[in-house]
């Protein structure tokens, strides 16, 4: 089951005892999933959701909290719809429900954000508002670089109200418009986990956190492997470059190179992949890596000085792009 479906399934089965929270959830669900229609002079409340369990929860809450019956219509998958959709409709008492849930204000005008009783309610009401909004139009992507918990909103006022509810819960959410649709997005991994718990999807949070941890472990392992590969490549190129410079130095100096410097240089050329420490152990008598490095450095310096005097290419000229590409 996809993460979004897991969250919605868990939330649709959540038992909430506090009446004000149940009302806040219902108001948000109707606001984010529904619309008000005037048919034959009557106000009709409709809400379209993507799971049967959400439709059942919605109908049950409408009846238990306000005593109104509702109809449900199933829109089968087909065309642009990949899955079935469920439309819950309250026709006979639509206007009364719209007023009681805050979809209409006292003058009978549609409320553009969230109802005042939800915005000014308790922390539990803020959690319930997020639960209702997510059940209506929420989504949760798999953990990763672009992971996000997102809710599509019916307008900018509703988006800002949802951002405010998140702020009351100590969670940073951002409102933005994407392709003409207002959305509220939470991207931080810790904040996503906290919000899932706040809404009541603790089991899904544990699953999400486990997947997030596994992904982070894999990403860390990949970074370390790439780091090691890069270090090996750098070391190989440095060794090839050093050997090429030493070869050129011996060429420039010819018979004039001091024996101890020539010996260190020949070791570098003969054992191109060996570390300085390994070259020191191969020397006769053995030397420290600092001694080997010092002798090679002096050899190169002497050769470069001679090259300048003679007006010929120095040791750096031996290190070509082609040479490094082959390393």
UniProtKB/Swiss-Prot annotation:
Keyword flag Cell division: yes
GO biological processes: cell division; regulation of sporulation
Q: Which UniProt keywords apply?
A: Cell cycle, Cell division, DNA-binding
Pfam families (alphabetical): HTH_WhiA, LAGLIDADG_WhiA, WhiA_N
Q: Tell me where the signal peptide lies.
A: none
Molecular function terms from GO: DNA binding
- Which domain of life does the protein's organism represent? Bacteria
Q: Which residues bind DNA?
A: 275-308
The record's function comment reads: Involved in cell division and chromosome segregation.
Q: Which family does it belong to?
A: Belongs to the WhiA family.
- Name the UniProt record assigns to this protein: Probable cell division protein WhiA
Highest lineage ranks of the organism?
A: Bacteria, Bacillati, Actinomycetota, Actinomycetes, Mycobacteriales
């Amino acid at each position: 089951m996809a993460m979004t479906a897991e969250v919605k399934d868990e939330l649709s089965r959540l038992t909430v005892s506090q009446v004000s929270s149940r009302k806040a959830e219902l108001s948000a669900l109707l606001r984010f999933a529904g619309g008000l229609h005037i048919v034959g002079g009557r106000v009709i409340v409709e809400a379209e959701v993507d799971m049967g369990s959400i439709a059942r929860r919605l109908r049950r809450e409408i009846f238990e909290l306000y005593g109104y019956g509702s109809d449900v219509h199933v829109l089968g998958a087909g065309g642009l719809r990949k899955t079935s959709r469920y439309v819950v409709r309250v026709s006979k008492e639509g206007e009364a429900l719209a007023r009681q849930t805050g979809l209409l204000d006292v003058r009978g005008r549609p409320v553009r954000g969230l109802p005042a009783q939800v915005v000014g309610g308790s922390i539990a009401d803020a959690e319930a508002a997020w639960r209702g909004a997510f059940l209506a139009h929420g989504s949760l992507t798999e953990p990763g670089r672009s992971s996000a918990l997102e809710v599509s909103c019916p307008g900018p006022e509703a988006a800002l109200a949802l951002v405010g509810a998140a702020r009351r819960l100590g969670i940073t959410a951002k409102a933005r418009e994407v392709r003409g649709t207002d959305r509220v997005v939470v991207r931080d991994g810790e904040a996503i986990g906290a919000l899932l718990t706040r809404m009541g999807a603790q089991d899904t949070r544990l699953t999400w956190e486990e997947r997030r941890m596994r992904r982070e472990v894999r990403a860390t392992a990949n970074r370390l492997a790439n780091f090691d590969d890069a270090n090996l490549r750098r070391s190989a190129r440095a060794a090839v470059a050093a050997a090429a410079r030493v070869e050129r130095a011996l060429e420039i100096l010819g018979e004039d190179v001091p024996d101890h410097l020539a010996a260190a240089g020949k070791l570098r050329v003969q054992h191109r992949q060996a570390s300085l420490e390994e070259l020191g152990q191969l020397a006769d008598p053995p030397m420290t890596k600092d001694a080997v490095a010092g002798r090679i450095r002096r050899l190169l310096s002497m050769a470069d000085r001679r090259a300048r005097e003679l007006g010929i290419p120095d040791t750096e000229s031996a290190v070509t792009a082609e040479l490094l590409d082959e390393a």
